[in-house]
Structure formats: structure tokens, C-alpha cells
Swiss-Prot record:
Positions of the catalytic residues: 148
InterPro entries cross-referenced by the UniProt entry: Kinase-like_dom_sf (IPR011009), Prot_kinase_dom (IPR000719), Protein_kinase_ATP_BS (IPR017441), Ser/Thr_kinase_AS (IPR008271)
SUPFAM superfamilies: Protein kinase-like (PK-like)
Summary of the function given for this chain in its UniProt record: Protein kinase that regulates cellular motility via phosphorylation of membrane proteins.
Enzyme Commission code: 2.7.11.1
Domain Protein kinase stretches: 15-289
Residues binding ATP, per UniProt: 21-29, 45
Family membership noted in the UniProt record: Belongs to the protein kinase superfamily. Ser/Thr protein kinase family.
EC main group: transferase
Post-translational modification: Autophosphorylated.
Protein name per UniProt: Serine/threonine-protein kinase A
Lineage: Bacteria, Bacillati, Cyanobacteriota, Cyanophyceae, Synechococcales
Amino acid sequence: MTPDSRHRRLLANRYQLVELVGSGAMGQVYRAEDKLLGGVTVAVKFLSQALLNPRMKERFEREATISALLGEKSIHIVRVRDYGLDEKEIPFYVMEYLQGENISDVIKYRPLKVERFLKIARQICFGLDCAHKGIIYQGEACPVVHRDIKPSNVLLVEDPALGELVKILDFGIAKLVQAAEESKTQAFMGTLAYCSPEQMEGKELDSRSDIYSLGVMMYEMLTGEMPLFPDNSSFGGWYEAHHHTKPHPFSARYKIPASLEALVMNCLAKSPKGRPQSVDVIIRAIDAIEAEIKAPPISDTEKTQIAPHLLNTDMEATVVAQRGPGIVPETRLPLVSELCKQLEWPSDKPKQKIVFPYVLNAAEGKLASLWVMLNQEDILTRMSSIRYNQFLLMTSPHPMVLWITVLYHREYGPRWLPCYLDLKTRSGQSFAQMLGESGTYWLLFFALENPTRCQHMLTATVAPNQCKLLKEWAQTSQSMPGGKPQVTKRLLKQELDRLKPKIEAKLSQVKPSFNKEVSGL
């Protein structure tokens, strides 16, 4: 039966077909009226007659089932209302009729602005997160991998509450991840430009494959361009690009925040282990980036606002309101952030969870920084944490400063980043002096899974009274006797262990109304 012959048919004694609105490899979609419900507009999708074999019929029915179950769980997935066979035994299913534009059309002439992108990307992630968390299928909890995330499969419709509502379409090649299923090579399915490397290999897939496709799409949404270009459009050309070609860096003309650039590039990691391990991690990162953009500039009053009762009397503290994670005045940020994006993990440092101080030679001069290597997921989680720092001096048997940095998250607890400055060395003295004079330092994060480049950046502010002490310590330590630095280091570590419960207890009381920094004595 041709598409024209279906025009104005009454299907299943209920759905009046009105017009053909779309067609693809899997079939045709019609606008129709549901006569049983007073003529409400619906969409009806038929399986293509060229695909009428038992295997494709089963897949089409599964697509309808997956969409129906997911649509009940998330407003960001198209809802399926009915399924059946017409008089010719051709399968069809009925879904909500949506009027809007797909993202492919929206970005055809210009990319999305960052603010709009973040709102849309968050909703896409909500829909994907729902799919990845799974459905109950044949009595078993099964995660769903979409396998065809791309701009044309994401629709934007007007919504009175949200302004723009995202709907993920086309679960036609979605994969149910079932526990009893053996891992085996699968036939390739997907759209070449958006496929993950493992998808092109026909490997068993999980949610991280969709995250790669999402990364390709997010790059395209922000730039209007693809992150990768093959030598030719064949399967082999795209296979080579997805496996071995580095994504193009973002052009400065798009004015993409460094934290957003890093997030997209993380999603585009060649290895699944190098990507965010769940969509929930991406959602938290988007929230942190949005807070960074929306928060107001820091006033001089906020920079010096004292909260003497935040910590106990021997740890007097300053609370500094931040515009977002790691934002410093506009005159400094672009220069330093450009530098940080170029930094590589030193070849003489082990690729493991460590912390060490480092002097940045930026256009603004020499800047203090703390280099940190953590799991990638932990890094993304910590972008919206409360930042705390404190400096402890021990003069005997060897003058040394314990530089304490803590990233505290109400849900995930503290991440302790201790570092030691030997005040009998020239580098230790100059670093303490630098911290005291500048009153700020940079936190540079490198991921264990992908340690080549700096992934994220934050800044930390040192309280004025701590700055004064650091400068004094740098001067007076020169005349102090030295010896047995390892003993001093061990004693400082014991003191940190004693202070940890007090610091954590007080940080847990800080209201999470805005991102805060805490610097204490």
C-alpha cells in the first residue's frame, strides 16, 4: 500500500489519517485524528512495506514498547499511546503529535547561544538519563541505549511552563541491555557522523556510547560544525575519524566557557572510560556551568565579608561569594584560562591521585596553582562544591606549612587536597610569599582516565589574615633551624587528622544558597 493510498483512511476504526508528514528508512509518519477522543491530533507511524519480515516487525513492536514505557517516565521522550496491525497486517503505532523544530533545523544557520544551549542540553540529558536507568521489560529491569542520538532526533516544541520543551525521538534502533544476554559482536547500526568508536566496532554498548554521540551533538549545537571530519564519508573514513582523529578545539569566537569546553571534550573521549560515566554527571556539570554564568560579579564588600562564627574560635573564617565555580575578575580570566587549557600533566609526575604546587607563568605574571589528579567523575562532581582552605605552620624540628584545600559537597562529602611547603627551600619560601601577596590560587584538575590536558579549573581565595601570616612565615623561616622534614610532615598530617571532623562539621552547616569559599585559620 502506497502512502497516497492511505490518505483519509480510518485506521482501526479510530484513527483518521489526514496527511503524510514524514518518512524514513523505517517507515512513514502521518498526522491523524483520534475519533474516539473527539478528533484530538495524533501521529501514526507505519513500518515500511519493504521491511515486512518477522525480525523487523519484532523490532518495530519493541520500539513502540520502549517508547511507551519511557514516555510514561519522562516528558522528554515522545509518548506512544497505541500499537496495532492494519488490515494488511502492517504494524503501526500511535504517538503524541508534536509541532516544533528539530535541532538540526534550529542550528542550520547559526549555533545556539550558551545560555539557550544549557537549557536544551539539560533536558536532553534528563530524557537520556531516564532511558539509561531503564524500564521493566518482560519482568526484567533493562537499561535502554538509544544508539542514534543526533540533532534530527531531538525536537523542540513550545511549552507554556518551560518555554522550550525537548523531546527525544526515534527509538527505532534502541538497545535493551539485558543481564542474561551474552556479550557478542553486533551488526553496525547508527548514523556514522555521531557513532561512538565502540558502536562502529559492533561491540556491546552501554550508556557511555550515547554520551559520545551526545558530545558530538553538543559540539555541533555550540558551533554549527562537526568536531571531526573524515577523509571521506565512507564507513572506513568515519571509523578512522572516530578512532584516531582529535576533535577540533573550540574557536575563541564562540566565547564558550572553559568548563563547558572541557565537558564536551570529555564526552568525546575515544575510550568509554575517559567519558563521564553517567548522564547524571553531565547534568551536575551543566548546573555548575549555569551557576557560573548567572551569578553576579563579586563586589569588594563580598570579598572581605567576615563570618567569625562559621568555624570555631581557633579557625576564624572568611566567606566569599563567588559568581560560580572558579571565576575571577574578567581582566584575568581569559588569559589564565587560555593558558590552563594548553597545560599538560608533567612527564615526571605519576599518573595517580596526587596534589602538588606549581607556579604558572601567565601574561599577568607568576601565579600560584595547585595541580590535582582525580577520577573524571569526581572532578565533575566537585565543580559545584564549597571551597575551603587553611594554612598550618610547624617550626620544629623543621619549618613547614601544611596547605589544606577541601572541596565539600553536601551529598558526596569532602575531598581533601593537602599539600606541604618546605620553608627551608627557596621554592617553598617563594610559594608562601606568592600566596600571601596574591591572596588567590588556581586549582587545575586532570582526569586519571584522560590525563593529557587540564580538564577543569577553579580559583580559591585566601583570607587576608592568612595572607599576612604566609608572608611573615616566608620571611622568618629563613633564620629558623632545619632538620628532619619528614618528622614535621608526619606531625602536620596528624594535626590535619585531628582537625578534619571539625572542618567537615562546620562546612556541613554552610547554606548551599550560592557557591562559597571558606578560608580559615
